[in-house]
């Protein structure tokens, strides 16, 4: 018997700095209600879905910085999301900036949660691959200070929910094949992935025309090579003067895009996702147990950066 989940990739248009949490939550609620009306069981929102992408600015005032974070989830302004999800019987994935106090120490993470159809949090993920830079770089029109405002997460976990095995990732994680493989080795059948990606890359502007191609390429490869669904959901449009690529989509285990957003605003892309389709890839071409050779992959965990080989020398054939 097929295991079907009707999934909505809930793209958001730009969120401006002047927008309140209440403004944004109302947009998320509209997505939940529309997705429910269209028969969905799961809605996937973007990374940092409650605020503008604040790492584009260098800020020194702690109070100004803290205003972008959630110190509890659900909190006073987000509880209605959980209540509505429970009332509608629909689950969701949500990305946000997390402010945690652990052993008396204040910590900040770029976080996502998975909420089931009862309104309960069943999984939490903290972004592992933080892009950008840690120090203010005045030459940039927009900063990319994720390394300044967040600590990295430590693991790629999976959770049982929605009738299958679910994984989570955030934005830059999608560019690293290890992201998908670690979850694939835990049997992931659907990976939920929110992102905020600018069109322009100041250190390498020659790549700008390829930004959408690269965005889809890495998610399609990750889906196919691990026999898993991937739901990639963006913040899109011109946000505080910065162009965001959008391109939200749902990708099958075949690597094919089966649903996609076509605008730069609030939009749903919906697909009927059969989790049993994963098996045809996990049991054949990508049967890990039969074909993988982990004994040959030691460098992946032993070495961080590339090291070139020694000068050319003759070898014994």
Residue spans for each PLM region:
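Short beta-strand segments enriched in small/hydrophobic residues
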Residues: 1-15
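Short, glycine-anchored, charge-dense loop/turn motifs used at functional sites
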Residues: 7, 114-122, 251-259
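Residue-level recognition of beta-strand->loop/alpha-helix junctions
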Residues: 11-13, 46, 126, 195, ...
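Active-site catalytic loop in hydrolytic enzyme cores
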Residues: 83, 100-203, 207-217, 283-287
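Short, well-ordered beta-strand micro-motif
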Residues: 114, 160, 250, 270-272
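A short C-terminal boundary segment appended to hydrolase-like catalytic domains
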Residues: 279-317
């Amino acid at each position: 018997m097929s295991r079907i989940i009707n999934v909505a990739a809930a793209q958001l248009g730009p969120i401006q700095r002047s927008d309140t949490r209440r403004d944004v939550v109302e947009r998320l609620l509209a997505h939940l209600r529309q997705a429910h009306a269209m028969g969905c069981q799961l809605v996937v929102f973007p990374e940092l879905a409650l605020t503008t992408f604040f790492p584009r600015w260098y800020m020194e005032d702690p109070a100004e910085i803290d205003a972008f974070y959630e110190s509890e989830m659900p909190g006073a302004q987000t509880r209605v999301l959980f209540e509505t999800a429970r009332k509608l019987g629909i689950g969701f994935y949500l990305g946000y900036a997390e402010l945690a106090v652990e052993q008396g120490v204040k910590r900040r993470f770029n976080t996502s949660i998975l909420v089931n159809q009862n309104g309960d949090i069943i999984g939490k993920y903290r972004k592992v691959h933080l892009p950008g830079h840690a120090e203010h770089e005045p030459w940039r029109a927009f900063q990319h200070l994720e390394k300044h405002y967040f600590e990295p997460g430590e693991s790629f976990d999976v959770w049982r929910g929605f009738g299958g095995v679910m994984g989570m990732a955030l934005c830059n994680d999608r560019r690293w094949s290890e992201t998908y493989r670690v979850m694939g080795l835990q049997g992931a059948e659907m990976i939920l992935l929110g992102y905020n990606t600018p069109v322009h890359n100041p250190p390498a502007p020659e790549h700008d025309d390829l930004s959408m191609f690269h965005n889809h390429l890495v998610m399609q490869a990750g889906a196919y090579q691990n026999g898993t669904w991937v739901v990639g959901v963006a913040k899109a449009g011109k946000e505080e003067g910065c162009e965001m690529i959008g391109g939200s989509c749902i990708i099958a285990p075949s690597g094919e895009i089966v649903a996609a957003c076509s605008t730069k605003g609030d939009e749903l892309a919906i697909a009927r996702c059969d989790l049993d389709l994963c098996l045809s890839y996990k049991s054949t071409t990508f049967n890990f147990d039969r074909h993988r050779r982990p004994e040959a992959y030691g460098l992946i965990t032993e070495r961080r950066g590339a090291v070139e080989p020694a000068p050319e020398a003759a070898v014994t054939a």
